[in-house]
Amino acid sequence: MMIDIDHVSFQYSGAERENLQNFNLQIEKGECVVLTGESGCGKTCVTRLINTLIPHFYEGEMSGTVLIDGVDTRTIQPHDLSDKIGSVFQNPRSQFFSLDTDSEIVFGMENKGMPYQVMLDRYQQTIRELHIEKLKDRNLFDLSGGQKQTIAFASVYALNPDIFVLDEPSSNLDPEAIQELRRLLLLIKAQGKTIIVSEHRLYFLNGIADRIVLMEHGKLKQSWSASDFALLSTEQIKALGLRSYT
């Protein structure tokens, strides 16, 4: 089991109610799980459990356990899992540490003290495998929203984590950029990476997701395999408050 969230309840400091209530979710290695539901349902809270921002960055009251590849996240610091987990946030600018694309792609590797040749090899591999030659040596502030998202993804990809966590990655993207995001997700899916995506838009994840998890008021309301979810009619999906899957 790659990820095991066991009976977790969590309430942010200052929140009026629990943000997660007795939440359970198990994710196998190589599985792509999509968390969906209305804003405020707890999707982002789950992603923060997985990338260990909860409990180490966001304060609050937590019960239950979160195991990442068998390791209890309360017993280690986020940087100890940086080889295993990579995160792409809703607003890529929030995770940039550099002014140009090349520096941003290698930043995580530099921060880990990797040897120069290893960094160079991984940088070149990232550029080649993601097909982003046109984004080399660019000013980050000259890029479109979609291009910024691609660089944020590339900086994570260069570290070669086992788990990719993406929090509403399509929210600020146009249709063309969403298709580029889909291409990147298909790539890491084919590599056997474990993928967790918090999303309102679902159509671009058709053919990538293995499981769709609907959340409501901090609880897991319903879960489908991708094949079962694809059988739902447009009316059924709309009645659940979800967007089209096709």
Question: Model features per residue range: what roles?
Answer:
Residues F164-D167:
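Catalytic Walker B motif of ABC-type/P-loop ATPase nucleotide-binding domains
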Residues T65-D80:
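ABC ATPase NBD Q-loop/coupling interface
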Residues Q117-L135:
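Conserved ABC ATPase "signature" region
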Residues N139-L143, Q147:
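Conserved ABC ATPase signature
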Residues E199-H200:
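H-loop/switch region of ABC-family ATPase nucleotide-binding domains
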Residues K219-L242:
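Conserved beta-strand-loop-alpha-helix hinge in the C-terminal portion
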Residues P175-A177:
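Helix N-cap at the start of a conserved alpha-helix in ABC-type nucleotide-binding domains
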